[in-house]
């Protein structure tokens, strides 16, 4: 599948987030999305929940495992329901769920969160999750922050999820026609690979301002540094350090374009301890210095 196919889906998901405040997550129940390595840096980024509540909980081994078991429970619920429904995750997060089928097999789901639902029950679940994590009850404040819209617009959610689901079904169909997947089979290794990469990228996107080491990311993903490094090289064709620097440079370009901050301040804000190293990395990646990039943006000759 050509990358621009996934670019269209990613743009649609980004629009739904900016227009409606929805958090869209793609569930792959059979491992078909991990068949192409390029997907790890496109639709694969939508496999994990990135809200701070979920990110905090998943640092704990027991809750990480509970989260993975929840995916299987969700798959079973999708197979039973066979149409969209609103469900409550074990950690107190309500989601609009749109099952994706190929024939009679449920291959995935499009999940949309960000709205309150069944508040009392979900508050109890959230408190239980905090207790299981042995965390400060103040963590519950992050649970409240997950609600970015006042209510679920199920009609709009069904329309948007149906379109994304159709893209996913088409992709699965093409994989099947090329003999890359077989109907009814589950590719657990692909599921695990994409899940790890998605969580690693989520960690980088949420921690780019801080000093990040490969060991920190591996710890969050509950795997070894060597395993994570191998996944990055094989699927992203870049090292962990290179991906971290790319994320920081992307943020730096936005700051250069949208603010009047000094270059040295932007370097520090983006996690580069040495402004000279920041300028070196920036020039290596964009072919110009940060100051020249800012000037070109203001003259309309470059894009962030």
Question: What is each stretch, according to the model?
Answer:
Residues 2-5, 10-92:
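Structured interaction and signal-relay segments at domain junctions
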Residues 198-212, 232, 236, 253-262, ...:
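Basic, amphipathic alpha-helical hairpins
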Residues 215-224, 228, 232, 266-273, ...:
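Append "Primarily bacterial transcriptional regulators
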Residues 280-304:
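…primarily DNA-binding HTH/wHTH and HhH modules…
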Residues 1-23, 108-185:
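Juxtadomain coupling helices with adjacent low-complexity linkers
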Residues 234-274, 295-304:
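Terminal helix-turn-helix DNA-binding modules in bacterial transcription factors
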Residues 171-202, 206, 214-221, 234-246:
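Short, Lys/Arg-enriched, Trp-marked, Pro/Gly-tolerant hinge/linker segments that flank
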Residues 70-126, 160-164:
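Sensory/regulatory domains in signal-transduction proteins
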